[in-house]
Amino acid sequence: TNVVNGNILVEGSRIRLPKVKWITMKKHREPAEGLRLKSVTVSMEPSGKYFASLLYEGYSCENQAADKDYSNAKILGIDYAMQGMAVFSEEIEMEEAGFFRKNEKRLAREQRKLSRCVKGSRNYVRQQKKVARCHEKIRSQRRDYLHKLSRRITDQYDIVAVEDIDMKAMSRCLHFGKSVQDNGYGMFRNMLDYKLAWKGKELVKVDRFFPSSKKCSKCGKIKKELKLSERVYRCT
């Protein structure tokens, strides 16, 4: 909903929407000074929770220098990995992801309970919300972890290079679908993109067909044939 003639107001921890009275809300953070509220988008999760996304507009010249000096830049390379989501060129502490697999047993248990309920009954609706809350918890854990990891990387490095891999195509593969969706690599890459832009830094997308694994890191020689079973590449 767009802001027109003061139809949307935000005061402290309250918000007023068109055709709705004042509603108490939990504000995530305060907007920066000098910004103007442009629109509000209200969404509802399957668990029954409501969220309001407030869009503010303004202009800032910060971090928009014409010439960037990367002579002393700290550079990080990131490669997608099925186990652990990613492999980094520098040592970065990571906790074990796979939040779906961690909660898979509990989710399956709640889904079995739902399958035994009579469709349309009160117990069915109640159990539906329990299943939705399980999915919501998994999404929240994954998003929180990726936000913290991407923030740590953008604070430490000036240039981040990532593989421009087609995540949708990989998720359609027979054996990779669950791992690809559970890792959240596409979401992680998007977070890096806008967070680096905020700080005036750069995200470089490397072509998916670039032979980075076949190329020697010292002399640059490319090994033409490199099997997936070869985990160590010794350049001659």
Where are these regions (language model features)?
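Acidic carboxylate diad motif detector
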Residues: 1-43
